[in-house]
A protein has these predicted regions:
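Bacterial N-terminal signal peptides that target proteins for export
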Residues: 2-14
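Bacterial N-terminal signal peptides
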Residues: 13-23
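Internal "kinase-insert"/substrate-recognition segments embedded within catalytic cores
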Residues: 279-285, 291, 296-307, 330-333, ...
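Zn2+-dependent metallopeptidase catalytic core
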Residues: 243-249, 313-330, 424, 438-441
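Short, well-structured beta-strand/strand-turn elements
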Residues: 325-341, 466
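Middle-to-C-terminal accessory/interaction subdomains
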Residues: 213-221, 228-232, 255-257, 265-267, ...
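Conserved NTP-binding catalytic cores of kinases and kinase-like/nucleotidyltransferase enzymes
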Residues: 214-317
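Feature for extracytoplasmic/surface-facing segments of secreted or surface-associated proteins
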Residues: 25-215
């Protein structure tokens, strides 16, 4: 928190207000641009906290020479019993804040009255990022990334936390929470590395990660036992089951749950390693669960098998990218997924992605859930629809959730489903889809859609060259009520993203193993995306958003690939001992003999693809020549 020099602060304010009058107290050491011409440096007062618990007796400084410690002429102070500090710093200082937690002197409120046993340092990358100095802000600082939202994305990945997990701390985390457990593990690491860690070094984050305790490296485990060990043979009929979910990173590591399970999926269903749909029972056991591996609590989940994807990272990478700071301004919500190792009826069945399924809920796509009472006549949202060439949705004598538009685009009305939708709601959403299409193919207007959502969805799909994204299947859209707070939510939005296991070169048809050439923008079949590019405003928006997102996109993709591979290094060996499919041709064009080679191909494909798309998105003329 920044304050004016006359604002009331803690007991330290007066000292540093006076210090600001003395040139030596506030002189810059050259690591920050706050000094000017050797004269007196204008000061400003900041106030913050040092937090794991509240840290009392920690030395805090503005690290003007950026050497990762409090020394020289760095303005400094000491925290009080509430972890609070007040400090005068050069006005506009972008230099890091460093907290030195001192053995025998500093105390953590999580262990009242007990001095800290080992000295360690924490940091915040700058006062502008946060004046709270925490275990998480230390990793953000150690990343060296000055795009702080991107840095938080990267830190979450290293910690095995889902994309939307909050890592900002303004107070100690709740006792027993995942946040508290992970923060404690980070502090353990900072103590372990205290003698060698240089917080100012370019490789500081790598040094910290290399010393992570097992709790931050091991994958969670999900043990499923069906009633009577019954086999799961249907995508429609659930089997009762019990579930035991263990997260090594959490304080309470294991939760036992009741529920049911069935098959799911299309091409992967029927393969040796099957995908599943899980629904937990809302009972006393479920009530005790605060979250699912850091993902928001919900009863409904998908277990993605990723059988065809021998890197095991394509779905997680694409979904995490959609949730990242690079794309979450255009895509309102994207499913999160966490890698788990699954044991089914005592049989180890490999690495899966425990994934939020697509549904309207406060913990998922947070738009209005309409009344199913015809008398209410709730019509204008929210809806979820899917483009699906299989038309795999309900069609009965009274209700038909299938729609083939005049341009032959095949839709399924996903939400509300056949048990909840009213006749008037069904008519409303079908008419909306026809109107949007008529605007696109007639006067080429886009007033009824949120163009940023269509652009961002397209950019990720085109980057991954996703075979299904030309309006084949798993291409979702949604609309909220006309009373939604955000006006863009009242329009038809593209998303959420889904189904990337056979993307990023992992397919042997339509040349989609190649990194050059546009795919989603081509009119291979009825495809609104292709038609949208006839609108010059949509094309201009696509080019500008690509250029805006490009630096963060490349950093996120490469960093995440490294991180996922690191976290999978042991578990993938068990997965492929169970499923020895390296060297086999499934749906893939290229054949590789190891997990390392599979991961390297994903990296090469996406980096070469980004480089090619740079050329395609260089200008409208380039796009029209290369992508239409």
């Amino acid at each position: 928190m920044r304050t004016t020099a006359t604002s009331p602060l803690s007991r330290f304010a007066l000292v540093f207000a006076l210090c600001g009058l003395i040139a030596a107290c506030g002189s810059s050491g050259g690591g920050d641009g706050g000094a000017g011409g050797g004269g007196t440096v204008e000061q400003e007062a900041i106030q913050g906290k040092v937090i794991d618990g509240y840290i009392d007796g920690a030395l805090v400084c503005n690290d003007l020479n950026a050497n990762g410690r409090c020394d020289g002429s760095d303005p400094r102070t000491t925290t009080d019993s509430g972890g609070v500090y007040a400090l005068n710093v050069p006005k506009g200082s972008t230099a890091p804040l460093v907290a030195e937690v001192i053995a025998g002197q500093s105390r953590d409120s999580d262990q009242p009255g007990v001095p800290v046993d080992i000295s360690y340092r924490m940091a915040s990358p700058s006062p502008a990022y946060s004046t709270s100095i925490t275990p998480f802000s230390t990793l953000v600082h150690a990343s060296g990334e000055r795009n702080f939202s991107l840095a938080e994305d990267l830190v979450r990945a290293e910690l095995g936390l889902p994309p939307r997990f909050t890592i900002t701390m303004t107070a100690p985390a709740d006792a027993g929470s995942l946040t508290q457990a992970v923060a404690k593990s980070i502090v353990t690491t900072l103590k372990t590395t205290a003698g060698t860690l240089d917080l100012s070094a370019a490789n500081a984050l790598k040094t910290i990660v290399a010393a992570f305790p097992p709790a931050l490296n091991e994958l969670p485990q999900l043990r499923i036992t069906t009633k009577g060990n019954a086999p799961i043979v249907s995508k429609e009929i659930y089997v009762d089951a019990t579930f035991s979910l263990t997260n090594p990173a959490a304080s309470v590591q294991t939760y036992d749950l009741n529920g049911k399970i069935r098959g799911r999926g299309q091409s992967t269903w029927g393969q040796p390693k099957n995908p599943y749909k899980i629904q937990f029972t809302s009972d006393a056991s479920y009530a005790k669960v605060p979250d699912f591996l850091g993902m928001k609590k919900n009863r409904n989940w998908a277990l993605l098998a990723d059988y065809f994807d021998r890197s095991l990272i394509r779905n997680k990478l694409a979904l995490s990218l959609g949730s990242s700071s690079a794309f979450n301004d255009g895509l309102k919500w994207t499913s999160s997924g966490q890698h788990v190792e699954v044991v089914l009826n005592g049989d180890y069945v490999g690495v899966y992605l425990l994934t939020e399924d697509i549904r309207i809920a406060s913990s998922r796509l947070n738009i209005k859930e309409m009344s199913d009472d015809p008398a209410v006549n709730d019509l204008d949202g929210g809806y979820i629809v899917e483009v699906d060439v299989r038309l795999d949705c309900y069609r009965g004598p009274d209700l038909d959730l299938q729609l083939i538009t005049p341009q032959q685009v095949p839709f399924c009305i996903d939400t509300p489903d056949e048990e909840a939708i009213t006749v008037n709601q069904l008519a409303y959403v079908k008419d909306l889809l026809r109107q949007v299409e008529q605007d696109l193919y007639g006067p080429n207007r886009i007033e009824k859609i949120n163009p940023a959502s269509f652009v961002d969805w397209y950019l990720i799909q085109e980057l991954f060259r996703n075979n299904d994204a030309i309006f084949v299947s798993s291409d979702f859209m949604w609309k909220d009520t006309q009373a939604a707070t955000n006006p863009l939510d009242r329009l038809l939005n593209m998303g959420p993203l889904w189904d990337f296991d056979r993307a990023a070169g992992n397919v042997n048809y339509f040349n989609n193993w190649e990194t050059e050439g546009c795919w989603v923008s081509k009119p291979y079949q009825p495809n609104w995306i292709s038609k949208l590019f006839d609108n010059p405003d949509f094309l201009a928006l696509t080019i500008s958003r690509w250029k805006q997102k490009r630096p963060a996109l490349e950093a996120f993709v490469n960093f995440s690939i490294d991180t996922y591979a690191r976290r999978l290094v042991v578990a993938q060996q068990r997965n492929f001992q169970r499923w020895p499919i390296f060297g086999l041709r499934l749906t893939n064009y290229y054949v590789f003999s190891s997990h390392d080679e599979e991961v390297a191909f994903v990296r090469r494909f996406l980096n070469e693809r980004m480089a090619w798309l740079d050329k395609a998105y260089a200008s409208p003329e380039a796009f029209n020549a290369m992508c239409k």
